[in-house]
Structure formats: structure tokens, C-alpha cells
């Protein structure tokens, strides 16, 4: 039974998660994901330039990583929550309605990384260089994406009377509107722990910590991305234990709790191995490989240069 909620402060949730403009339905969940992609791409390009690359190269890789990541995130969600789409009375086509919500971060990261590998290979950039540059941006994107769950009134914890308790409405996913009571007011399911907010704030803090540690200690190539996985999974493990919405379980624990624990251990081991290696960035080097960025990919070979004769004419000297 839900505890009695005393009067006081609470975090309100929207009663509308979508708007219709003519025949087009705009989901706020999708807008949050899009905003996260834009912010993450901006920070990634900025950090990638500091590692010897260019904005154009960063965007080329991002254009591969993003669609792969979205597909991977959806696949992970559908596989781990297949009962939502398959079985008696279920609609399998719902698995394709990504705008209604449902992306698994681990599928997004894994398949997105595969897309980034393709883009990095095509642009002559080492994957570790791009991954290290992208790590804080991924956390910013995840922090923004969690607000899509706020619009959908989902991903909350146990009932609570804390001052920052989250109001949750009974939402109709088909219409993007809260279900109304007999007197015409939005139906409230209760007040719960705002786990979406906890995770969003954790991602912001982890992003700031990553940037600080990368600058302070010049972490080795690939270790920044490994540390991103360590930090995120540490928080996600705790937040999964707090959540009260339905999820498939293994031995009494949510699937994502197990995944977070296993990835934390694996990423921690990788970080300890890679942290002392040479850094994946150096804007001061003029060697053929600028710490992971192959200058020959742009047609420039630092072993070749131009000289000017006494008449001002330039001659290419191999």
C-alpha cells in the first residue's frame, strides 16, 4: 500500500508528453534525445579538436555512431523487455515505435561504438582517440535524455514523502496525455523517488569529473572511455536497485542491475590497464600520427613540405 502523502513540496510531472501539429505528432521524449545528441556532439567535436582532429572528422564519425546507437538502443530494449511487444494480445509493430520511448543504453553504446569504428576507419582516425573525446559528451547526452522519461512519467522509484518526491500521472502512451478522472483532472498515481533525476544529475557530475581527470592526469589512450563506463555503471547499479517499475529479473535482481555490475568490473580492469599508456591526444605533435589522428588521411604528409625560391615561387620538396 502506498504511504500517506503529507502536504508539502513535490516535483510535478507533465500531463502532456506529445503535441500534434497537423498530421505530425511531436514527442517530447524524442526532443530530449535529439537535444542530448546535439549537446553531446558539440562537446565531442570540441574535445576531438584538442586531440589533433577536426570538427569535420568528428562529425563524420558521429554521423555513423548516432544511427547505429539508436538502432542498438532499441534492440537492447526490445530484447530485454520482449514481453511488451510479443505474446498474446501484444502488438509486435510496437517494437518499431521508438518515439513512444524505450532505448537501452548498453545497446546504444555497443552498437554506436561499432558505427564509430566504421566512421573512424573511413576518416583515418584511431577509435580510442574518438572514444576518449566522446566520453563526457555521452554522459551529457544521457543526462538530457533522462528528461524524456520525466515527460513520459516513467522510470521512478519507490513511494516516498521526501520533499523532492516526484508526482506521477497515469499516462496514455497512444495520445501522450494524462488519463482524466471523473471530474476532469489528471489522474495521479502517487509520489515516488525521482530516479530519472538522480541519474541525470549523476551523469552531469560524472561528465565534469571525467573532463577534470583527463586534464589533470593525462589519462592513457582508451582509459577515458573505460572510466566513463566505470562511473556510469556505478551510479546505474544503485539507481536500478531503487526503481519500482516492472522489469525482467535474474535471481531477484533486474537485468540492468546485473549488466551494470558486470560492465563495471570489466571496465575497471580495462581502465587500470590503459591509464598509464600514452594519452590519446597531443596538439603539439607534428609526427605522421598525432596521437591517434593520422594526418595522411587528409592528404598531408609531414615528411613533405614546400620551399620558396628567391623569386617567390613555391616548389614542392618530397
Swiss-Prot record:
GO cellular component: plasma membrane
Biased composition (Basic and acidic residues): 293-312
Transmembrane spans: 23-43, 59-79, 98-118, 124-146, 192-212, 219-239, 253-273
Molecular function per GO: phosphatidylglycerol-prolipoprotein diacylglyceryl transferase activity
Pathway: Protein modification; lipoprotein biosynthesis (diacylglyceryl transfer)
PROSITE patterns: LGT
Subcellular location: Cell membrane
Cell membrane is among the record's keywords: yes
Chain segments carrying region Disordered: 293-318
InterPro entries: Lgt
EC code(s) of this entry: 2.5.1.145
Top-tier EC class: transferase
Pfam families: LGT
Keywords: Cell membrane, Membrane, Plasmid, Transferase, Transmembrane, Transmembrane helix
Membrane topology: Multi-pass membrane protein
Source species, domain of life: Bacteria
Function according to Swiss-Prot or TrEMBL: Catalyzes the transfer of the diacylglyceryl group from phosphatidylglycerol to the sulfhydryl group of the N-terminal cysteine of a prolipoprotein, the first step in the formation of mature lipoproteins.
Similarity remark: Belongs to the Lgt family.
Name of this chain's protein: Phosphatidylglycerol--prolipoprotein diacylglyceryl transferase
Naturally occurring in which organism (per UniProt): Paenarthrobacter aurescens (strain TC1)
Name of the gene this protein is made from: lgt
Amino acid at each position: 500500500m502506498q504511504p500517506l502523502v503529507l502536504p508539502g513540496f513535490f516535483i510535478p510531472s507533465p500531463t502532456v508528453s506529445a503535441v500534434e501539429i497537423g498530421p505530425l505528432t511531436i514527442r517530447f521524449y524524442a526532443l530530449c534525445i535529439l537535444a542530448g545528441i546535439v549537446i553531446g556532439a558539440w562537446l565531442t567535436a570540441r574535445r576531438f579538436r584538442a586531440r589533433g582532429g577536426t570538427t569535420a572528422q568528428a562529425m563524420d564519425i558521429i554521423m555513423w555512431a548516432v544511427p547505429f546507437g539508436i538502432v542498438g538502443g532499441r534492440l537492447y530494449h526490445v530484447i530485454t523487455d520482449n514481453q511488451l511487444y510479443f505474446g498474446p494480445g501484444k502488438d509486435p509493430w510496437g517494437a518499431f515505435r521508438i518515439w513512444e520511448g524505450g532505448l537501452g543504453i548498453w545497446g546504444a553504446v555497443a552498437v554506436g561504438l561499432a558505427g564509430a569504428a566504421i566512421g573512424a576507419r573511413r576518416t583515418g582516425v584511431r577509435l580510442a582517440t574518438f572514444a576518449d573525446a566522446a566520453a563526457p559528451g555521452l554522459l551529457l547526452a544521457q543526462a538530457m535524455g533522462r528528461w524524456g522519461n520525466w515527460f513520459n512519467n516513467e522510470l521512478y522509484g519507490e513511494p516516498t514523502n521526501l520533499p523532492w518526491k516526484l508526482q506521477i500521472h497515469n499516462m496514455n502512451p497512444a495520445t501522450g496525455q494524462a488519463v482524466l478522472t471523473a471530474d476532469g483532472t489528471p489522474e495521479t498515481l502517487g509520489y515516488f523517488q525521482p530516479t530519472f533525476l538522480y541519474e541525470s544529475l549523476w551523469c552531469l557530475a560524472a561528465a565534469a569529473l571525467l573532463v577534470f581527470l583527463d586534464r589533470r592526469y593525462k589519462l592513457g589512450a582508451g582509459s577515458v572511455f573505460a572510466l566513463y563506463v566505470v562511473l556510469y555503471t556505478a551510479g546505474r547499479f544503485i539507481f536500478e536497485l531503487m526503481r519500482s517499475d516492472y522489469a525482467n529479473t535474474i535471481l531477484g535482481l533486474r537485468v540492468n542491475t546485473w549488466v551494470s555490475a558486470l560492465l563495471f568490473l570489466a571496465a575497471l580492469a580495462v581502465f587500470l590497464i590503459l591509464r598509464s599508456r600514452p594519452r590519446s591526444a597531443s596538439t603539439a605533435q607534428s609526427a605522421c600520427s598525432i596521437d591517434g589522428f593520422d594526418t595522411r588521411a587528409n592528404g598531408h604528409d609531414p615528411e613533405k613540405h614546400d620551399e620558396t625560391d628567391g623569386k617567390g615561387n613555391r616548389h614542392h620538396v618530397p
